[in-house]
């Protein structure tokens, strides 16, 4: 077990904060009926003060934690149903994000809150598809175009998350002694910076997030 931890230490470049850390101060908006859009295996039940609905697309494998199986642009609930929506690292995987945003607006109650996080500087990651990335202006545009009011929008996850992801993909594909030594040298440094550095997060963000309100 100890040997496995040592191997992981020298062979893992990336560090991703927990969903608790990512949502952070915005947890206070997760009250009432809350939709976890594109939930997958991500558990936010401990963050919700109210009733949680986990939604995801059908995959052929039953997940007892999913309450709603549907496309994200066709959620089978009535209008004005949810008090809050969490959509974390999902919108890049949908073919038509504007259509999804219109559906979010439909199913949310007036005065409800949307927490939406999207990637900017991140490699392609299929789940099962991967269509787009979002700049800060692009994120604001799709939110406001669909009649949400932006409360706050900001970069989060630092540039080291981007660099470490790329280095992880590249260097772990190489098996020579040289590249293995490079992994042992670089990966612990990158992982530390991912975890502890906020340098340039407002200028070179790996991702963006927005808190928006249905006025």
Residue ranges and their predicted role:
Residues 25-125, 135-140, 210-213:
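Conserved SAM-binding loop
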Residues 10-14, 92, 200:
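Short, surface-exposed alpha-helical recognition segments that flank or form part
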Residues 98-99, 103, 113-215:
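S-adenosyl-L-methionine-dependent methyltransferase catalytic module, highlighting the catalytic core
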Residues 1-28:
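Class I SAM-dependent methyltransferase Rossmann-like catalytic core
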